[in-house]
Amino acid sequence: MKTALKVASASAALFASVAMTGCGSNSSNTDASASASSAASGSVSGKVEVYAAASLRNAGTELKEAFEKENPGVEITYSFEGSSKLVQKIEQGASPDLLITADTQNMDKAAKLDEFKDAKREVIATNKLVLVTAEGNPGKINSLDDLKNSEGVVAVCKVNVPCGTLADEELKKHHIELKNATTEGNVSEVTTKVTTGNADAGFIYTTDLAAAKKDGKNLGSVDLPDVPRNEYPAALTTKGSSSDAAKKFNEWLSSDEAQKILAKYDFESPQAN
């Protein structure tokens, strides 16, 4: 009887050992499968600091929301300002992960900095300068030539900011010297001047005009057909190049999903030009 009990006990112990080994094996396989699945999905995490041109503010907010929804472990933070101001901040020691300017000239300046050593740039969108007039067109400005004799306030960006560079070139081309100009730091500030009635007209982008109209602002506009479209290049800093989250966001900006979001705000795809 004792012998039988010993055999039974040994059998039970052996069965428990095999069962535990089996469970351990399944757990390991499950963990391995989860890791493989995570790697395959390309999931990333971390914070991504983006310096972006002021004209990207509205579109940029939706881009952030869409990317973070697909990548819940990522947090995108923005600084929106004039492109020249963003480059200046980096020159003075700021260290974002990604820079998006509203022209190639300011990106060229950034490319000379150590923070962008060996950086590759990718144009993610294009935009177009337009002359807008305040509601009711108090300055009676219906063409670019009307600015020659206008006494009204005309808002323009600083000349070292992309929207200011384009406006300055266009005015010089048509031999126009503004009699009553107000100079602003970026295109958003110019738009505000016009929408609040503190300027009779201003040079902004078609994207800013579209946003103002969506907000119920009844601005008039004058097309500037001979002004070239300006490009929006994006480039990772050396800091961003070592971040999987920053690299993935930078690549995603050229995806169909991101391009559809940009198109909603009147940006055009670089492939369309």
Q: Where are the model-predicted features located?
A:
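Short, high-confidence coil segments that cap the C-terminus of an alpha-helix
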Residues: G73, S95-P96, A199
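Bacterial N-terminal signal peptides that target proteins for export
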Residues: M1-S11
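Short beta-strand-centered segments that line the small-molecule binding cleft or hinge
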Residues: V87, G93, D97-D103, M107-L113, ...
